[in-house]
Amino acid sequence: DPAFNSWG
């Protein structure tokens, strides 16, 4: 989830 983390 890009809104929370950059990896997933």
Swiss-Prot record:
InterPro entries per record: Kinin_peptide (IPR013202)
Protein's UniProt keywords contain Cytoplasm: no
Top-level lineage group: Eukaryota
Subcellular location: Secreted
Function: This cephalomyotropic peptide stimulates contractile activity of cockroach protodeum (hindgut).
Chain positions found as Glycine amide: 8
Example of a GO cellular component annotation carried by this entry: extracellular region
Name this polypeptide is given: Leucokinin-1
Coiled coil: none
Swiss-Prot/TrEMBL GO biological process terms: neuropeptide signaling pathway
Pfam families: Kinin (PF08260)
Keywords annotated in UniProt: Amidation, Neuropeptide, Secreted
Species per Swiss-Prot/TrEMBL record: Rhyparobia maderae
